[in-house]
Regions:
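Hydrophobic, lipid-facing positions within transmembrane beta-strands of outer-membrane proteins
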Residues: 61, 124-126, 140, 146-153, ...
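A beta-strand signature from Gram-negative outer-membrane beta-barrel systems
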Residues: 48-50, 98-141, 152
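Short, acidic, small-residue-rich periplasmic hinge/interaction motif at the N-terminus
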Residues: 1-35, 70-72, 78
Length: 234
């Protein structure tokens, strides 16, 4: 008989991607909720990572990765490429003042700064691969949130035995706050997210995702013209 020595197998406590073991950072929902100063904005969360800096315009979340430009970043939501995931976006950039996504419906984010996966091409600086949560087949769940700039409502549940859904709607109150402070502009935004999944068979699932936002900017005509207002608008 042949004797075989004993072997001890221990799992690694760290989740590593086989395709991009070094250049990918995995952001969980707990990271999104607990990182201070980010206001649950997924673009602001990664600013503490090596090689990542922000636009010098303080109120925007444009990403500058490894010396690249703000337009060289690509975003994916459940494998679908999205040009920009922010409100009040500008042409030639990938950022904005606030994210269009409700973080309550995000399950995980993979942030690549190099060695991009073959099925996530089209970027020069970085890729942010966002995975949404799935609906709940056993119950209906609702959540209301009050953020620094908006109020929102999200829902997760099921429609029948084979269809699940997630949904979110948010409305900003910045226009009221800016008017109260006497600022010359009054920004306002609305966004919504809807995802439905229907199980057609054991191996096939139909998925529909809808994402949209409306941005509005008005001048506060109820204040007097002064040097401070002219400076802010310039």
């Amino acid at each position: 008989p042949t004797e075989i020595s004993a072997s001890t197998v221990r799992p690694s406590p760290f989740l590593r991607s086989v395709e991009s073991p070094v250049s990918v950072k995995i952001i969980s929902i707990s990271d999104i909720e607990n990182i201070p100063g980010a206001n649950k904005d997924i673009a602001r969360i990664v600013r503490s990572y090596p090689g990542v800096s922000f636009s010098p315009i303080g109120y925007r979340n444009d990403l500058i990765v490894r010396g690249g430009g703000p337009s060289e970043n690509t975003f994916f939501i459940d494998g679908i490429e999205i040009p920009n995931i922010n409100h009040f976006a500008t042409q030639g950039a990938s950022g904005g003042p606030v994210s269009i996504l409700n973080s309550d419906l995000i399950r995980e984010i993979k942030f690549y700064t190099g060695a991009f996966p073959a099925n996530r091409g089209g970027a020069l600086s970085s890729i942010m691969d966002i995975t949404l949560k799935e609906g709940i087949s056993e119950k209906q769940a609702f959540k209301a949130t009050l953020g620094a700039s908006e109020v929102g409502m999200s829902a997760r549940g099921h429609i029948g035995s084979k269809t699940t859904y997630i949904a979110s709607a948010r409305q900003s109150y910045l226009q009221l706050l800016f008017k109260l402070l006497g600022l010359p502009m009054m920004p306002n935004y609305i966004d919504g997210l809807f995802k439905v999944e229907t199980k057609l068979s054991r191996y096939n699932t139909f998925t529909l995702i809808a994402l949209g936002g409306i941005d509005r900017m008005k001048l506060n005509t109820g204040i007097e013209d002064n040097e401070n207002s002219a400076y802010i608008l310039s």
